Amino acid sequence: MGCSHRLLLWLGAAGTILCSNSEFQTPFLTPSLLPVLVLNSQEQKVTPTPSKLEPASLPNPLGTRGPWVFNTCGASGRSGPTQTQCDGAYTGSSVMVTVGAAGPLKGVQLWRVPDTGQYLISAYGAAGGKGAQNHLSRAHGIFLSAVFFLRRGEPVYILVGQQGQDACPGGSPESQLVCLGESGEHATTYGTERIPGWRRWAGGGGGGGGATSIFRLRAGEPEPLLVAAGGGGRSYRRRPDRGRTQAVPERLETRAAAPGSGGRGGAAGGGSGWTSRAHSPQAGRSPREGAEGGEGCAEAWAALRWAAAGGFGGGGGACAAGGGGGGYRGGDTSESDLLWADGEDGTSFVHPSGELYLQPLAVTEGHGEVEIRKHPNCSHCPFKDCQWQAELWTAECTCPEGTELAVDNVTCMDLPTTASPLILMGAVVAALALSLLMMCAVLILVNQKCQGLWGTRLPGPELELSKLRSSAIRTAPNPYYCQVGLSPAQPWPLPPGLTEVSPANVTLLRALGHGAFGEVYEGLVTGLPGDSSPLPVAIKTLPELCSHQDELDFLMEALIISKFSHQNIVRCVGLSFRSAPRLILLELMSGGDMKSFLRHSRPHPGQLAPLTMQDLLQLAQDIAQGCHYLEENHFIHRDIAARNCLLSCSGASRVAKIGDFGMARDIYQASYYRKGGRTLLPVKWMPPEALLEGLFTSKTDSWSFGVLLWEIFSLGYMPYPGHTNQEVLDFIATGNRMDPPRNCPGPVYRIMTQCWQHQPELRPDFGSILERIQYCTQDPDVLNSPLPVEPGPILEEEEASRLGNRSLEGLRSPKPLELSSQNLKSWGGGLLGSWLPSGLKTLKPRCLQPQNIWNPTYGSWTPRGPQGEDTGIEHCNGSSSSSIPGIQ
């Protein structure tokens, strides 16, 4: 610029600086250079501007206590806030700032350090704007934090980035129709092809988000301490060919000498860098140029009144492509203004003098923000551990259990002992005697109960199926089902909308395994509304011995499953609750559970891998879609794991579905979700707050999904291999996390670690998880990653994996028996031999050794009966009086 158009006089201690060179770059306005005199080329006179950024005149008093939170003061768009806006926004808080009114510091907030020490500074960059037809999600701004040493009275400059503007609502009726989806680029540009130099389409993209910067002055030059980059703006519409896009990780610069260049751009502007210069109106301005956001492209404003500008902090203005995000280095955007080209995020920065506290993560969905708080220095403590006492404005050392802090606030002293050794000895002897008596009483009761249960036949899938098919009716009352002398169970009325299936229309075929409440069978059902052909289903039943609470839990599971309707959640076909036994009919998932499928799909040396990385990503995407549906319906599953996910088939057209809303035992009992007592906790799938405090939120399932991802990409291995539940609890409580599975792609493992954030609010929701999995499916490096080759045969990681998953493939009835109201009432009986056809052999005896089996999933003991006990399976030293039908 020439002095004939503008002349800036910088008055400071060193003298006067004149602008007379066309290549001159405006120097950064410092407090020592105020007041400023501006020469107006039209009026040709000097007008003084009052000094408002002088450090000695700052109004915020020293000694106030934090934390201090700085925001945009209600400002939005290209320009920053004013002093009046910030005075109103910070009313009632301890934050007092001075806002620049002119020059490069216009909109920048100046704050003084209240005391010398270390401070934790957390910065949030602003998000990018949404496109007209690309509005499902916006590009998140970057968050990061670092620790810096600041001195009392030192001025700190805070530039809070503002969100890039959205394309909608537009500025004209035609653009508003595009926003509503009632018009497109072809209709709105009809007739403009003959205009010379006019492009077919312009506008509809979102502006880039502004960067949030914290800096100070060194020798009159700005020195950035922390820069949180802004998110890029979304394009007019989503990319039609998603296979060529890939997720870009958050970028961080830590070199002080690194260039702060601006992003490349075309019709849409790139984001500004720390030392860049804007070469077009659409490009974002650097802090040296006032940090304003770039303007929307002129073609878009002339055609349809689009005006999506970049946010304050250097966000690039939009055209059809999205604007680039601001940062230490600005984000690029499309130079050819493609309709589907999103603007890129900027690059964040941490000065080498600071200590990075949290890695950058794209989380901000709106305007930027800055939080500054005192960071305690624990170097003087003997155990290097302390807590900040806000009331005393000091760090108090933490002492281990059994000691207390001395008056010097440093030394840990042993607690005084008041009890004499004689009293302690007496207490120990009394406790030992009481423990011995209680142990003897427990052993006596256990012995008596074992003698009473000796020879009792435990129910199994074969026995329960035979009872359901038997015509003999037992009339003895079941004390666990109803009280002696009362009438049989009354029918349960169903809520509206649920399909009632008559027991006469249900045919049992074979046993599939054991569920949460009873056996699960494969069968056929007829007579459904709108379908006359038999439909294969999975039938869940209540066991013979059940309490009233079990019946209520069974009904609750039926109501929950019937409520959901999603392609990735097992569908409820119908219910039968008018007579005992109660039945829940679910769609049959012939592919089995995901854990078993993954274990049997492990590639071996010299064999072609049955699965690809695309197959594993598809399984993860299916379950994530089901979890997203549950999250939108405010439902917390609490037990997302591979064992609870079912597959429609084992072939290439498989679909994974969430199939357990009560299959884990006691999942609806209150004790299941409490720590301690007789609880069943899936320790290896639960976050720290659920294990330690019993807190469950929507982010509980996010943690569990991260563990499920680990199971999928390890091909069915048990999480935290080789560790007990207590070791896992200690492991995650101290901030440790699992290593990636063998050959796991980096972007997939990053999703796992984001799901395993210690703070629940930092974990992504399932909408973000789905978006990141979609990026992985478009990354060639991820898709071409090889699967780990299993060197040997498949081993059982846990003994309990063989329990409850028995598949009786040969168990077939010679003739399917309809489940009539007469034979449904039979829960006992032994007339099984009559079902054996000629030429069929009985089940070969198997030995069962007495043992207790540890369940590594839930942390519970599952007892097995002693040898010779009749458990519904033939033994080595005896034969049953009845045979299992259909075994050859």
UniProtKB/Swiss-Prot annotation:
Binding residue positions for ATP: L512, G513, H514, G515, A516, F517, G518, E519, V520, K540
The record's account of how the chain is modified after translation: Phosphorylated at tyrosine residues by autocatalysis, which activates kinase activity.
Disruption phenotype: Mice do not show any decrease in newborn neurons. Mice lacking both Alk and Ltk show a strong reduction in newborn neurons.
Topology class, membrane: Single-pass type I membrane protein
Glycan attachment points: N377, N409
Activity regulation statement: Activated by ligand-binding, leading to homodimerization and autophosphorylation.
Annotated spans, Disordered: 226-294, 857-888
CDD domains reported in the protein's UniProt record: PTKc_ALK_LTK
Membrane-spanning segments: 422-446
A GO biological process held by the record: positive regulation of cardiac muscle cell apoptotic process
GO CC annotation, single: plasma membrane
Extracellular side: 17-421
Enzyme class, UniProt record, top EC level: transferase
Function summary: Receptor with a tyrosine-protein kinase activity. Following activation by ALKAL1 or ALKAL2 ligands at the cell surface, transduces an extracellular signal into an intracellular response. Ligand-binding to the extracellular domain induces tyrosine kinase activation, leading to activation of the mitogen-activated protein kinase (MAPK) pathway. Phosphorylates almost exclusively at the first tyrosine of the Y-x-x-x-Y-Y motif.
Name of the protein: Leukocyte tyrosine kinase receptor
Organism from which the protein derives: Mus musculus
